[in-house]
Amino acid sequence: MLEKTMFFSSNEIERAVINEVLEEVYKALKEKGYNPINQLVGYIVTGNPIYISSYKNSRNKIVGIEREKLVMALLESYLEIWDV
């Protein structure tokens, strides 16, 4: 049986990590009863990690990603949905 080796660019891997972190943080904030969108926007706009709960290590996960990269990943995802 032949197996194919798959190659992924560092951008693809980075984006997958960002998406995973955003999903985990979103779910954790929702579990705690917060409005995840408002909390994430507050963090992205101000850079103040106090907007993100430490529940399930969410704060540490999100601050491990540059805010600029978060915005880029969100914008790219949005534009992909609209096939722009």
Where are these regions (language model features)?
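Intrinsically disordered, low-complexity, basic-enriched segments
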Residues: 2-84
